[in-house]
């Protein structure tokens, strides 16, 4: 599967762009500096909208769960860093972001969203793309939602843990796998242990 320059099991498109950081400062965020860690990169259409703050706040509030498994979370839209900052100064009960624990990239030229294949050309905004990048900076997962539907933080965290399990143990994760549940060997004989125990 590919989206723009983003292809599964290929290097994630590089970026080095200014972001609003959790401490309220502006700083360039270079994907290369995250080598050795897992990364969740998610795009959203616009600041000061409706579904977007529900997603961003969920990822921000739960970022420690990602950090605990050596994963960083980065948000991105086409808005400026100043717009991001203004949005964090609006309280959540009024649709703002409040305090953030994750960086928010300011993709003003739309180069990142083009590279990742999430630009909705007719509106000039990003679809709700989400990408999981492994420590070698290869893309392991790509999902893109149309604008009206938000994403599931639990499922994103589950996927990160599943890919990590596969990397560490060499077995594959069946449907609805969660840490601690059964996995299987990816061969005709080894997989029978799983199937016989589940059916």
From Swiss-Prot:
**Which species is this record about?**
Trypanosoma brucei rhodesiense
Write down any Gene Ontology CC term.
Answer: cytosol
Q: Which reaction does it catalyse?
A: a hydroperoxide + [thioredoxin]-dithiol = an alcohol + [thioredoxin]-disulfide + H2O
One GO MF term on file is: thioredoxin peroxidase activity
In this chain, composition skew of type Polar residues spans: 189-199
Name of the protein described by the UniProt record: Thioredoxin peroxidase
Q: Which Pfam families match?
A: 1-cysPrx_C, AhpC-TSA
GO biological process assignments:
cell redox homeostasis; cellular response to stress; hydrogen peroxide catabolic process; response to oxidative stress
Residues covered by region (Disordered): 179-199
Chain segments annotated as coiled-coil in the UniProt record: none
Name the family the entry cites. Belongs to the peroxiredoxin family. AhpC/Prx1 subfamily.
Domain called Thioredoxin: residue spans: 6-165
For this UniProt record, the keywords arranged alphabetically read as follows: Antioxidant, Disulfide bond, Oxidoreductase, Peroxidase, Redox-active center
EC number(s) reported in the record:
1.11.1.24
